[in-house]
Structures are given as structure tokens and as C-alpha cells.
């Protein structure tokens, strides 16, 4: 069965927004679990500027047409976080980089160019998120 790339991209974007796991290079990354780990690592309250995921105004504006105040609303912020992570995975694949939880956490903390510059260095933020992702039981 032939699937047009024009149909495939919206389907993939929709899958990331509804919370389905994303598979890249044979590795499945559960974006909802990763977002929970990012929330835990950031340690901010939802009522704080940028919400629990600590969006900057610039990042929020790149990803959403909604007002920055919506970054403090959990459902909307998680939707935009899934979009950000999914777009990062796509960009990494285009750049020949195999996406991992550690690299996605590094990108969340440092931005894409920061991730590229630091991806071969130890980075406690990324290590902490990686450990939460694989070792924490979110019950």
C-alpha cells in the first residue's frame, strides 16, 4: 500500500500530540514519560512563569500561537512540549543523529545548538532526566 508523504507527516504529528510513543532508529521513546521526567527535573510549579516545563517566551512563541500565559496550563504545555520534542527528533534524524532520551533532555536544557556542542560531554541535567526516565516509577 502506498502512503503519500503529504498524508504521513500530519499522521506523525497527530500521533505525537495524542501521546503515542515515537519510534526512531528502532528505539521507542515515550514522549509523555519523558515530559514527566522533564517536569520533575525542572522542579518548578505550574503557576510559575513558563510553567513546570519552564518554557521561555521565545521558545513558546516558536511553537505556539497561544499566549505565553498558557505555558502554565499543564495540558497545553504538555501538548507544546510533545510538539517540541517531536520536531527535535525529526531534526536530529535529518542531521544524522540518533535521538535518545539523554540527547532530548540535553536539547531541552541547552537548545539544539547547545545540544550539538555538548553531546559528547557529561551533563548532569541530561543524566538526571535519563535516570528518571529509566529508573523512576511514576505511580
What is the role of each PLM region?
Residues 28-45, 81-82, 103-112:
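Short, functionally critical alpha-helical segments immediately adjacent to catalytic or ligand/cofactor-binding
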Residues 36-62:
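N-terminal targeting signals for Sec/Tat export/insertion, comprising classic cleavable signal peptides
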Amino acid at each position: 500500500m502506498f502512503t503519500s508523504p503529504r498524508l504521513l507527516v500530519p499522521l506523525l504529528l497527530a500521533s505525537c500530540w495524542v501521546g503515542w510513543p515515537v519510534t526512531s532508529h528502532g528505539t521507542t521513546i515515550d514522549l509523555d514519560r519523558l515530559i514527566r521526567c522533564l517536569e520533575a527535573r525542572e522542579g518548578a510549579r505550574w503557576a510559575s512563569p513558563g510553567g513546570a516545563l519552564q518554557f521561555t517566551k521565545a521558545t513558546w512563541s516558536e511553537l505556539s500561537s497561544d499566549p505565553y500565559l498558557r505555558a502554565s496550563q499543564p495540558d497545553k504545555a504538555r501538548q507544546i512540549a510533545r510538539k517540541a520534542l517531536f520536531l527535535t527528533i525529526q531534526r536530529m534524524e535529518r542531521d544524522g543523529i540518533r535521538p535518545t532520551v539523554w540527547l532530548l533532555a540535553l536539547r531541552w536544557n541547552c537548545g539544539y545548538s547547545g545540544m550539538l556542542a555538548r553531546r559528547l560531554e557529561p551533563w548532569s541535567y541530561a543524566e538526571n532526566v535519563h535516570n528518571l526516565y529509566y529508573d523512576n516509577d511514576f505511580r
